[in-house]
Amino acid sequence: MVNTGRLGFVKLGAGIKEDRMAFSYMPGFGNDFETETLPGSLPQGRNSPQRPAYGLYAEQLSGSPFTAPRGTNERSWLYRIRPSVKHTGRFKAASYPLWKTAPNVGDHELALGQYRWNPVPMPKEPTDFIQGMRSITTAGDVLGQTGMAAHVYVANRSMVDDHFFNADGELLVVPQVGALRFVTEMGVIELRPGEIAVLPRGLVFKAELVDKDVRGYVCENYGAKLTLPDRGPIGANCLANPRDFKTPCAWFEEKETPCRLIVKWCGNFHVTEIGHSPLDVVAWHGNYAPYKYDLATFSPVGAILFDHPDPSIFTVLTAPSGEEGTANIDFVIFPPRWLVAEDTFRPPWYHRNIMSEFMGLIHGQYDAKEEGFVPGGISLHNLMLAHGPDAPGFEKASRADLKPVKLDNTMAFMFETRFPQMLTRYGAELETRQDNYIDCWADLKKRFNGTPEGDWS
């Protein structure tokens, strides 16, 4: 018996094949959703009936304290075949040595600097999504629920009977090569390059590969949950609009086979063995759930007369800190857009920043770098370390004919945080690190000669 979509489930047994052709989603950001796979499996008018329909168990998944203000109070009620206490046994230690957690300070000897990397190579050995997580930076302190970690994932096999949840934070996933399918306890998210997904803290999932090899970026958020930024004077529209976020409809599998559940908790990994799939939520309602977003639906705003505005106008999601206006994390993109400013140096300007910037490139070319920053690559410009256009980029932009120009076929992004991003040993010793990155500014000339015109020879 197989039915996928809004009423989607898979029951595995003799003569029954799995079908994962299509899955359905519900639009909106932060909505109080409700979804069921079997008619009447979602209770109405109450959360915890004495005997839920179909013999299910009622269970609450809380993403905030009970007493959090209504606007930030997040929880969902799950109606499942077995309660989650049946999805764990005795834990044993597990090892994923390349996935690091803050604080992770001083585990390498690389000197301070601006860093850039070519893409992380694809693995040669069989590697799933969790095994393929490689930490590049960590920031803050997971025990204080502040900060983040920036990772790259590479994988060439699906998680079949292995499942995972992260108690340390939510995961923002940014694919760069290859499509994946996140099969979660609350529904299925199909994800391709150009889209992002957010998997909440505590959500059980496994990652299946749609393509042979996949690579991408992950921001692990230890702090307050990612949310939409305030638009301020921009008004009620533009940037990331709530209707474009998609939360999966309920989907479950009833699978009686040996499985493993891997847990990340306070920086350590643990594994337990169970005799069935934990992805058994038949119905759910609430506002604590995974979602995805197509970056092509981001509606950018910008300067329409002169000057280059701050990159904060490109913020897709933000995780606030306790200090107003200062983010624990900002997720920022640099999408296709028109450049029309007059008498203006149009690329991003030279900068020293109190925030620390981890950048990646999904596809195309970034307008501040003429060469060296390639799709799948990484750059890291930390707290108060100077950065900006390379010498060829400066030369080109300073002499450009300032006609309207469309930046097309490009998508760069940034994980920005208020905390210093501490480089991991893996990142420091990664063979794709460009030792000569600092040289991209070597040919910037002194143009001051005491005259108002300067020396542009």
From Swiss-Prot:
Top-level lineage group: Bacteria
Record's keyword terms, sorted: Dioxygenase, Iron, Metal-binding, Oxidoreductase, Phenylalanine catabolism, Tyrosine catabolism
Signal peptide limits: none
Binding site for homogentisate: Y366, H387
MF (Gene Ontology): homogentisate 1,2-dioxygenase activity; iron ion binding
EC numbers on record: 1.13.11.5
GO biological process: L-phenylalanine catabolic process; tyrosine catabolic process
Residues that bind Fe cation: H351, E357, H387
GO cellular component term, pick one: cytoplasm
Cofactor: Fe cation
InterPro entries named among the record's database cross-references: HgmA_C, HgmA_N, Homogentis_dOase, Homogentis_dOase_bac, RmlC-like_jellyroll, RmlC_Cupin_sf
Cystine bridges: none
Pathway assigned in UniProt: Amino-acid degradation; L-phenylalanine degradation; acetoacetate and fumarate from L-phenylalanine: step 4/6
Annotated catalytic residues: H308 (proton acceptor)
Catalysed reaction, written as an equation: homogentisate + O2 = 4-maleylacetoacetate + H(+)
Enzyme class: oxidoreductase
Function in brief: Involved in the catabolism of homogentisate (2,5-dihydroxyphenylacetate or 2,5-OH-PhAc), a central intermediate in the degradation of phenylalanine and tyrosine. Catalyzes the oxidative ring cleavage of the aromatic ring of homogentisate to yield maleylacetoacetate.
Subunit annotation: Hexamer; dimer of trimers.
Similarity comment: Belongs to the homogentisate dioxygenase family.
Name of the protein this chain belongs to: Homogentisate 1,2-dioxygenase
Native species: Mesorhizobium japonicum (strain LMG 29417 / CECT 9101 / MAFF 303099)
